[in-house]
């Protein structure tokens, strides 16, 4: 039906008969001469038709998004009529034949216009996908999937599919449940990850497994979350953390070659505690400096009892400083107020600061600091004339969080972030357990191998876990797994899962661990998030063919939707109004 894709045509084809096919991107009638920009997956080429052509009458019928097959001779555009914005901007096709394969209603959205309301774009996603940018995104997504398969296959990994219909084993988020018609009153769950099945594959001697897996989590959505998503999932036997990290680094190096980036190995490693204390995040963005600096001891003799009391509780409280170089000349009073309102959203009671000026130190904190305390702060933060030093004080968790967010906000405001840089990082030595209102739970998941399970302080027990971070975004992570039944039971006990509950939820795993499970570990990389970063897309929805909204609905198909009474009866389900 066609001899060329649109952008395959070049000056060397001048004089040749060309046949192309695609959609009408734009249509113009200039004094009887018709110009059509034809679009296919590769890009645009201009078709031109004057009244002497036998295709002229057909050309007059063409409108936006009509499906066309065109035949004609390639020629150079006239002097001064070239379009440097197009790859084919020096040539055009003089129409000899034109077939309208299909007509189109007036499109409700402008193809490729990102300023169109996103809900409207999602409702007409099949039109939104016609944009050249969308095609490039999904072309790269396909290439990365192929690179992943080839790279892992070369390392001896087998691609094995694990079940989609499984048992509910909550891993932090809520499960999506599927009622069983055959087993009345019982439910399958869609997998939040293939975690337990891939461990069972290691017990089964598969040695190295991977899949590009679909996962499902019924959780509150954010800009980078979807209820169904894809991850590169892998597991390997007889390995340690270095082995797994090496596989991930090799894989990411191959993947980023696809967009022309050379990645240096090994990646930097940073302990979790260092990441939190110095950057206020377990996924720090290291494309810029601005570390958080501990200055609690500088407030020991503060005349402000709030600060001095915080300083005397270094286990649960923090006073952190953030020196922003040159900020005094840039941050007006209104900007400082905006920054204060920003951190208040995350639990701050205010935002104290010192302005380092030619005529001395200004700011609300000066009067509360001793001469020695002020001197130590200036030295420790390397504060110079023109700088502003911000302070956060209070509960450790809250302070680290909002000061970490302030660090990012300031970097964005001052344009300190190199948008083209790729800064990979491993965060390691995670805590095994985290405290909640209902006791402790596993920080990653309860199948992670602890390092020092006998430690009396549960908060000091570390996990054999690791996260890979790119530019402040968690790409993925993994851990070395528990491969002995006794250790798995100990971990369950720590998170208040008694033996009866453990058997009910995870009995099949505990049974498998009795039969000589090998040491094993693995990782998962968020595939959608990876493509979002590689394409510099604004939203994860841009890199998923048919995504859900932030309310977990599909505007295209109007899902979820009600089902009829007959379907409910077959599933032994009766609905009642929420109380």
Swiss-Prot record:
Localization annotation: Cytoplasm
Entry annotated with the keyword Transit peptide: no
Any Gene Ontology biological process: aspartyl-tRNA aminoacylation
Key word Chloroplast present: no
SUPFAM superfamilies, A to Z: Class II aaRS and biotin synthetases, GAD domain-like, Nucleic acid-binding proteins
Residues carrying the site annotation Important for tRNA non-discrimination: 30, 80
Family to which this protein belongs: Belongs to the class-II aminoacyl-tRNA synthetase family. Type 1 subfamily.
Oligomeric and partner information: Homodimer.
Chain's role: Aspartyl-tRNA synthetase with relaxed tRNA specificity since it is able to aspartylate not only its cognate tRNA(Asp) but also tRNA(Asn). Reaction proceeds in two steps: L-aspartate is first activated by ATP to form Asp-AMP and then transferred to the acceptor end of tRNA(Asp/Asn).
GO molecular function: aspartate-tRNA ligase activity; aspartate-tRNA(Asn) ligase activity; ATP binding; nucleic acid binding
Residues covered by region (Aspartate): 195-198
Catalysed reactions, semicolon-separated: tRNA(Asx) + L-aspartate + ATP = L-aspartyl-tRNA(Asx) + AMP + diphosphate
Residues engaged in binding ATP: 217-219, 226, 474, 526-529
Enzyme Commission code(s) on record: 6.1.1.23
Keyword annotations: Aminoacyl-tRNA synthetase, ATP-binding, Cytoplasm, Ligase, Nucleotide-binding, Protein biosynthesis
Binding-site residues, L-aspartate: 171, 217, 444, 481
Example of a GO cellular component annotation carried by this entry: cytoplasm
InterPro entries, sorted: Aa-tRNA-synt_II, aa-tRNA-synth_II, aa-tRNA-synth_II/BPL/LPL, Asp-tRNA-ligase_1, Asp-tRNA-ligase_1_N, Asp/Asn-tRNA-synth_IIb, AspRS_core, GAD-like_sf
Cystine pairings recorded for this chain: none
Name of the protein in question: Aspartate--tRNA(Asp/Asn) ligase
Lineage: superkingdom: Bacteria
């Amino acid at each position: 039906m066609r001899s060329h894709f649109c952008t395959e045509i070049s000056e060397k084809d001048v004089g040749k008969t060309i046949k192309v096919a695609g959609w009408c991107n734009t249509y113009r009638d200039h004094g009887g001469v018709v110009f059509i920009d034809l679009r296919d997956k590769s890009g645009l080429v201009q078709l031109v038709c004057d009244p002497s052509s036998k295709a002229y009458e057909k050309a007059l019928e063409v409108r936006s998004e009509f499906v066309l097959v065109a035949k004609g001779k390639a020629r150079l555009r006239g002097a001064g009529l070239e379009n440097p914005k197009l790859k084919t901007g020096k040539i055009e096709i003089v129409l000899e034949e034109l077939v309208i394969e299909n007509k189109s209603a007036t499109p409700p959205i402008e193809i490729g216009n990102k300023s169109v309301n996103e809900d409207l774009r999602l409702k007409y996603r099949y039109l939104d996908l016609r944009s050249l940018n969308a095609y490039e995104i999904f072309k790269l997504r396909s290439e990365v999937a192929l690179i992943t398969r080839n790279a892992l296959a070369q390392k001896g990994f087998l691609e094995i599919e694990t079940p989609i219909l499984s048992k509910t084993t909550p891993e932090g988020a809520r499960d999506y449940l599927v009622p069983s018609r055959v087993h009345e009153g019982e439910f399958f769950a869609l997998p939040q990850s293939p975690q337990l099945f891939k461990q069972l594959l290691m017990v089964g001697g598969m040695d190295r497994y991977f899949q590009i897996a679909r996962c499902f989590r019924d959780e509150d959505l954010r800009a980078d979350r979807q209820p169904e998503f894809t991850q590169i999932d892998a597991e390997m036997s007889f390995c340690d953390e270095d082995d797994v990290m090496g596989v991930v680094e090799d894989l990411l190096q191959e993947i980023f070659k696809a967009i022309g980036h050379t990645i240096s190995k090994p990646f930097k490693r940073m302990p979790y505690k260092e990441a939190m204390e110095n950057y206020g995040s377990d996924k720090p963005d290291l494309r810029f400096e601005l570390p958080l600096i501990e200055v609690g001891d500088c407030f020991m003799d503060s005349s402000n009892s709030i600060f001095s009391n915080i300083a005397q509780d270094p286990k649960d409280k923090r006073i952190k400083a953030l020196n922003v170089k040159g900020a005094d000349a840039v941050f007006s009073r209104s900007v400082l107020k905006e920054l204060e309102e920003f951190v208040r959203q995350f639990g701050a009671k205010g935002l104290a600061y010192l302005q380092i000026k030619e005529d001395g130190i200004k700011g609300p904190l000066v009067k509360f600091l001793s001469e020695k305390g002020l001197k130590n702060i200036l030295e420790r933060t390397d504060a110079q004339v023109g700088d502003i030093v911000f302070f956060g004080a209070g509960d450790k968790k809250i302070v680290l969080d909002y000061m970490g967010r302030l660090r990012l906000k300031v970097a964005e405001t001052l344009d300190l972030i190199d948008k083209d840089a790729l800064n990979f990082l491993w965060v390691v030595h995670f805590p095994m357990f985290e405290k909640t209102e209902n006791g402790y739970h596993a920080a990653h998941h309860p199948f992670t191998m602890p390092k020092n399970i006998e430690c009396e302080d549960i908060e000091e027990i570390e996990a054999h876990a690791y996260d890979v971070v790119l530019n402040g975004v968690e790409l993925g992570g993994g851990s070395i797994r528990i491969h002995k039944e006794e250790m798995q039971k100990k971990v369950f006990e720590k998170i208040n899962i008694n033996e009866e509950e453990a058997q009910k939820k995870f009995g099949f795993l505990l049974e498998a661990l009795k039969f000589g499970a090998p040491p094993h570990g693995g990782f998962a990389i968020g595939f959608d998030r990876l493509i979002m970063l590689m394409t510099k897309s604004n939203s994860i929805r841009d890199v998923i063919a048919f995504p859900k909204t932030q309310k977990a609905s599909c505007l295209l198909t109007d899902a979820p939707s009600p089902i009829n009474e007959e379907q409910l009866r077959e599933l032994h389900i009766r609905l009642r109004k929420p109380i």
